[in-house]
Every structure is written in structure tokens, then in C-alpha cells.
Amino acid sequence: MKIYGVGAAEGIGIGIAKVVKEQSVEVVKRAVSDTEAEVANFTEILELTKTETEEMSKSLERNASAKEAEILVGHIMLMSDPMLIDEMVNLIKNEKICAEYAVEGVCNQYAAVFASMDDELMQQRAADMRDIKNRLIKKILGLESNDLSTLPHGSILVAKDLTPSMTAGLNPENVFGIVTEFGGKTSHSAILA
């Protein structure tokens, strides 16, 4: 079998392939009667996710470089955007819908806008929005995320795509290579690799 792709980093890596499948989450529109409690839960999860992202960013800055940490700083900025948060909160309150459905709808709208832009770097913001969306929804639903920090020494990570938050958890001493179906030289996973 031959696989063709674009090299994003110099050199080669020889190791054992570790295939990572990102679990898909199906979000169902669900009515809520206590919108204040739903907003409070959403706000708590949003703050927790921002704190975790800040910790990942600081860890990256200590262990890699500021360039990689900036990607996650961008996530924090997006999760702190009052317009974005207000849209989600207003959907929960006005439509009386669950937080995960509001997060999915608003993040998908923003991701579509970023993806339609001509600038390749701005298009990467679509991946940021999808990453933020998936992390928030999993936390709201109480689901676990992939933990890539425990990959064994000599791993070649193979995935459809890697989100910035997934890549930030990698131990660079253990990962000898990364192969993804999506992305290119300017993708976050290539930058983090």
C-alpha cells in the first residue's frame, strides 16, 4: 500500500503505528425547563475548559515554544469572546434548549465563516472552533476525551485529523511521527509537530 501526502516537517520517523479515532458525539436538541441552571452549568464548563487550555498552553510554552502555545492562546481568546458566549447563552435562554445544542449550533456557524475565508491561516480558525465545540460538548455530556499523553515510546500517531488540544497533550519524546488525512503545512498539527 502506498500513501501520498505532503511532508510538514523534515526527516523521517520509524515506529509503531498507533491509530487514534476521535469519538463522534451526536448532539440531540433537548428542551430544558430551568434555563438558569443550564446557563450556570455551561458557564462553569466554559471556565473549566478555559483553565485547562491555559494550563496546556503554559505546558507547551515550557516544553516546546511560544509559537505552539499561541495556538491555544487563540482558543482561550475565542472562548472569552463575549459575542460568541452571548450567542450561546441567548440560545439557551430564548429557545429553552440544552447547552450542548447551543454550543454546536454557534460553533458550527463560526467554523463555517472561518472555513469560507480565502486566507489559509484564517481557515485554520475553523479547526479551532471545531476543537472548542467538541471539547465543550464532551464536558457538558460528561464524556472522556482522547488522552494522547500516554502513547508509548516510538509511536507514529495516525489519525484522520488532530485538533490543537489533542496535539498539545502529546509527549514529544514518545512520538516519532504524525500522519493525518487532513491538514497541511500550516495546519495546527503540523505546527505542533
What are the language-model segments listed below?
Residues 1-192:
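Non-catalytic, soluble scaffold/interaction modules
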